[in-house]
Amino acid sequence: MTQPVRRQPFTATITGSPRIGPRRELKRATEGYWAGRTSRSELEAVAATLRRDTWSALAAAGLDSVPVNTFSYYDQMLDTAVLLGALPPRVSPVSDGLDRYFAAARGTDQIAPLEMTKWFDTNYHYLVPEIGPSTTFTLHPGKVLAELKEALGQGIPARPVIIGPITFLLLSKAVDGAGAPIERLEELVPVYSELLSLLADGGAQWVQFDEPALVTDLSPDAPALAEAVYTALCSVSNRPAIYVATYFGDPGAALPALARTPVEAIGVDLVAGADTSVAGVPELAGKTLVAGVVDGRNVWRTDLEAALGTLATLLGSAATVAVSTSCSTLHVPYSLEPETDLDDALRSWLAFGAEKVREVVVLARALRDGHDAVADEIASSRAAIASRKRDPRLHNGQIRARIEAIVASGAHRGNAAQRRASQDARLHLPPLPTTTIGSYPQTSAIRVARAALRAGEIDEAEYVRRMRQEITEVIALQERLGLDVLVHGEPERNDMVQYFAEQLAGFFATQNGWVQSYGSRCVRPPILYGDVSRPRAMTVEWITYAQSLTDKPVKGMLTGPVTILAWSFVRDDQPLADTANQVALAIRDETVDLQSAGIAVIQVDEPALRELLPLRRADQAEYLRWAVGAFRLATSGVSDATQIHTHLCYSEFGEVIGAIADLDADVTSIEAARSHMEVLDDLNAIGFANGVGPGVYDIHSPRVPSAEEMADSLRAALRAVPAERLWVNPDCGLKTRNVDEVTASLHNMVAAAREVRAG
């Protein structure tokens, strides 16, 4: 049997780190490059500074193994596709490597981008590599070798991080009639083997292969494949020590399978699924067990005493127990330091990225030097945990009693056919009605007004006047274009979740808590720390103003309870189902107020419905039960004549298709443009009988599709959905596009609808 490589074991590390910059420097630099305002050299200088500062901070904090190659201009799966020579042939005409990379990510006028979808059950999106018959895997290691050299040149104990071959293929997509990508696994082993030798030659002592797919049910053969692949990779004579990282759940049978290979280290997520039973895997003896006891996905301070108890149970099960985050800190903000508005109690409960690194170092020190060496830190942790438990903001008996009463009486609407008849009589819409999802471009005037209000340069009345002017222009634009159901454009909203969080009790909105959603898109998730309630109406004033400007229906726009949870940092001291119902009650009250104000169409967005779906099938039914229940609680307070819409994002919908039907929304809009309407076959198969709008163009690309292209998409949709139930819309909100792109695209979309209506 191949023997493990003997390298100095590490004791304190993290799985990965963010790359956007503490002040979103990379976002600004890449967007400047795309717009032609920033040169290549300026972009690369920003990237180099971010890498250097990140590595230096991690090493200075006390990590004895620092992840590198976690920097990305856009996405780590796209980086891996470049590494393996697996970019789609359609980007080959772009001669420049960086521009070719961005063409695959964003598309161009002539090139469609790669499909985008959620990274497991997180709010990060990855680009889906396409594996076709012509795909030939070849190694292109320039990026990882250059970053390794950079880090070693700084004296950093660098550990390159690379998506592992099993995860890469299981998350890729077959195209052009090719078989399942995982069938190509044997072809990847020589490429990864070559990479190992080059990394060793470049000075790498350790390499990390990320294999989160091993905690899922994506392939029943994954454990056996992992054993075979990593046994083969360990046979490379000239290689670094190999650390295989699993995260986002329990690796189950994959853990002993990996442990039977000669890999030197295995990482487990002890926050999201794995437990101390991993200590019972005898093959771990002689290896490093990397224990993910510090939560890399949520913002709550680690209970150091509990974590040390877990670590104590693991000691002796492996040659070394190293302390780590449960996953990359990509998913949490950089640091608590800029959050000057936090009250002392709430601050004491939290840990962002920098604080989590310190927690890792403290725990590793406790293992090395004994608990007395970190007695002050343990006492501080104990006090914070106790403070949180007794804070009165965490329990509102009145809200809990209302939820119990509504759930007991049944949160359901009337018969769908009766609702449709009532809504048709009220709305008088044409066949194939056109609409948009909600948001319109956030113009410079909007951003200036928001900044001026925040700085105290204008008062609330002036801010409202400016936002009303934006709404007036958006309504006028939609009427000129000929859309049938309008939206107010959401100029007053900084984010579809944060806007509501700022108005709901039980939330705290951060000042600088940015995390990457995809590419240059950053979000600032609010912190849901206590029981949720709605002190006052949140949207009625804006929507009724918009409705006063037109005779066409204007949609009320709300975010659904599951999405608010998915895109927030949620309290971890009670079941998610209970928290979802509290948010749902607040949304329910808002829908009733909108209806009372005369709004006939209300959209309750659930783009993240699938995002919280547990990775193991055995756990999914219970989640879908309470997620659907929360949506129905939020939407069942209105009459049959009020049309409820919902919107769903970036998903492999087949896994939740029954739940989509169970939501019982009158109209469901779905992101289907990048996946070529595939979801409609799934809906058709289950007899989905309500309205559906399967996104006729992809708003995440600057490309403006032609009217004929969208008409073709509509004709394809009509093969699965009858005309009386088909809606015409973009596949998502338009906030991230500019006005010219939106105007041209919507003009073509309306023209496409008219062409198809005319037959």
Swiss-Prot record:
Residues the record lists as binding L-methionine: 437-439, 490, 605
Chain sites annotated for binding 5-methyltetrahydropteroyltri-L-glutamate: 24-27, 118, 521-522, 567, 611
Active site: 700
Key word Acyltransferase present: no
Binding-site list for Zn(2+): 647, 649, 671, 732
GO MF terms, alphabetically ordered: 5-methyltetrahydropteroyltriglutamate-homocysteine S-methyltransferase activity; zinc ion binding
Annotated GO CC locations: cytosol; peptidoglycan-based cell wall; plasma membrane
Catalysed reaction, written as an equation: 5-methyltetrahydropteroyltri-L-glutamate + L-homocysteine = tetrahydropteroyltri-L-glutamate + L-methionine
CDD domains per the UniProt record, alphabetical: CIMS_C_terminal_like, CIMS_N_terminal_like
Chain intervals for the UniProt region annotation (Disordered): 1-22
Alphabetically ordered keywords of this record: Amino-acid biosynthesis, Metal-binding, Methionine biosynthesis, Methyltransferase, Repeat, Transferase, Zinc
Enzyme nomenclature, EC number: 2.1.1.14
Coiled-coil region: none
Chain sites annotated for binding L-homocysteine: 437-439, 490, 605
Class of this enzyme: transferase
Cofactor: Zn(2+)
InterPro entries (UniProt xref): Cbl-indep_Met_Synth_N, Cobalamin-indep_Met_synthase, Met_Synth_C/arc, UROD/MetE-like_sf
Biological process annotations from GO: methionine biosynthetic process; methylation
Co-factor binding details: Binds 1 zinc ion per subunit.
Bias type Polar residues, positions: 1-16
Main function: Catalyzes the transfer of a methyl group from 5-methyltetrahydrofolate to homocysteine resulting in methionine formation.
HAMAP family: Meth_synth
Family: Belongs to the vitamin-B12 independent methionine synthase family.
Protein name, per record: 5-methyltetrahydropteroyltriglutamate--homocysteine methyltransferase
Lineage: Bacteria, Bacillati, Actinomycetota, Actinomycetes, Mycobacteriales
Gene of this entry: metE
